[in-house]
From Swiss-Prot:
Keyword Isomerase among UniProt keywords: yes
Protein name: 2,3-bisphosphoglycerate-independent phosphoglycerate mutase
Source species, domain of life: Archaea
Obligatory cofactor(s): Mg(2+)
Natural source organism: Pyrococcus furiosus (strain ATCC 43587 / DSM 3638 / JCM 8422 / Vc1)
Activity regulation, free text: Inhibited to approximately 20% by EDTA.
Enzyme Commission code(s) on record: 5.4.2.12
Amino acid sequence: MKQRKGVLIILDGLGDRPIKELGGKTPLEYANTPTMDYLAKIGILGQQDPIKPGQPAGSDTAHLSIFGYDPYKSYRGRGYFEALGVGLELDEDDLAFRVNFATLENGVITDRRAGRISTEEAHELAKAIQENVDIPVDFIFKGATGHRAVLVLKGMAEGYKVGENDPHEAGKPPHPFTWEDEASKKVAEILEEFVKKAHEVLDKHPINEKRRKEGKPVANYLLIRGAGTYPNIPMKFTEQWKVKAAAVVAVALVKGVAKAIGFDVYTPKGATGEYNTDEMAKARKAVELLKDYDFVFIHFKPTDAAGHDNNPKLKAELIERADRMIKYIVDHVDLEDVVIAITGDHSTPCEVMNHSGDPVPLLIAGGGVRADYTEKFGEREAMRGGLGRIRGHDIVPIMMDLMNRTEKFGA
């Protein structure tokens, strides 16, 4: 029996809701996607709930679920994955956080992403914090992608029950850090001191002086959340399925998840995880990796950002760019020898400007697939698909079975 290879493509935040501006269509339905529509015609569609119906999923828990893990058992906070994704090697007693560079004016957060500052600016600001902030514990502060960064408090894992200072919307002041026990109280006090001292460093930094003169939001404040410790990963993906797996990813969080479950991670030049990402560089790398790997995962981030920014036409344009990326892959493989799955890690509807509990469209095509009667890849067409409505953790087992890499249960 011939074993096939697998390609899993996640278009981050793909799912959406009908939008008046797009004639009542979703961005996916509005976009011109000839390659995904072709795959829909020769493949099978469905809907998937990353966690469960009606439950908005974080990108971390959603990816864990899609890779086949129970996030309720495996997940111990986002911070660890963020830190792993920026190349940090953590000890089991370290406590990691995800961080946003933000804009603070008159005690109020006016922009949670500091005008989406560039990765280069964020890295320079992070370096200034690492070199100029002094707190009672050893720490690592490192820029990630765009406005994102990572904070690690060495040896403070017992204080993981600490809250966050992120108000989650502009126009509100930062929250005080909450705590549940003495260990987390100590962490909360350290974080308050860290944020205060970092603000002093950031507010007068030359990058922010320049941004002020240009009328851009300054990155003068840190929003800290997602306390995370070592996750509970019972078995690596690569061990469970006996495959050699690679990930083509730019975003730190998703890099971290992939690394944690045993993937080799690649970030080709030009892949940024931002609007300016080079999706064709990802396509070329994926095709190259398929020569040596059994399973290749490709992550495309900008669709999610457009949903958060409530920009439906941009989201549609980004989906069209993703379609061209997928075309390159399809043109360079034999679909009889490969199983391709395309979905999102969650829905990020433009009207919500955040993750929602809406199901996500799912497409599977390639060797062994029993095609249904769907004609186009979109949310409403997916409702008619032969896969029905499944959970995110069902995707990989379905792929592996089509790849002829599963074993019989029972005699």
